[in-house]
Amino acid sequence: MKTAAKHTSKAAMIAEKDRAIVLAAREHFLRDGFAGASMDGIAKSAGVSVKTIYTHFANKDELFSKVMIAACTDHLLSQELPPDEVLAERFAWFREATQRGLMEAGREYLRHLLSEEQLALYRVVTRDADRFPELGRQYQKNISQGRTSILIAYLRNIARRKSWAKRDATQDAALYEALLRAGTYEEALHGLLTANPDAIEKQARSASKTMWKLLTTDCG
């Protein structure tokens, strides 16, 4: 009985150290990238020794790969896009086939896109994807395409409810993304713009106004 308890305690301790290492590594890699992050710095932040890190991970490459590919997981989407009913429960605007709903969809998109973590993640992916190709693939699949898929589902839902037979939701989503990003994303990415709630709302309002006009002008 004591032996079993001892093994359980040891396993819990190992798991706790693993979590501490992963969390510290995530912070350092998002801030400094692969080359800029040091194992000494990660160990210090995790409260462990460098030797302990190497008992959990074979090398820096393995640690980076595991941590950053995990960071490329959108927990809202899991593996697949949820059905419309689930999206409607998660986002009140998904039920609205209105310009206001479109604006709220844009605001949600921008809140995610312009969050500090997502901007940092994109910088790391563009910097290190050549060394870690799977990182780029996972980012494209789980982050970029995932959020676009929500917009496609929403715009398809609007077209269905409005009986807009000629609308192509995929093309409309690409256009709306471009309007939302215009004059904002690049500036935020390079630290020239702080994406506060007011700036996000202003951008979403402007983009949705233009997009709604386009949708209703040639609605089919």
Map each language-model feature to its residues.
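N-terminal intrinsically disordered/low-complexity leader segments
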Residues: 1-16, 85, 89, 218-220
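Hydrophobic/aromatic residues within well-ordered alpha-helical segments
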Residues: 17, 60, 71, 98, ...
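Helix-turn-helix
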Residues: 20, 24, 28-67
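An amphipathic alpha-helix signature
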Residues: 22, 65, 99, 103, ...
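Hydrophobic alpha-helical connector segments
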Residues: 66, 79-115, 169-176
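A short secondary-structure junction motif
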Residues: 74-78, 82, 116, 132, ...
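Amphipathic alpha-helical packing segments from all-alpha helical-bundle domains
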Residues: 100, 112-126, 133-160
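Hydrophobic/aromatic-rich alpha-helical bundle segments in the mid-to-C-terminal region
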Residues: 137, 145, 156-209
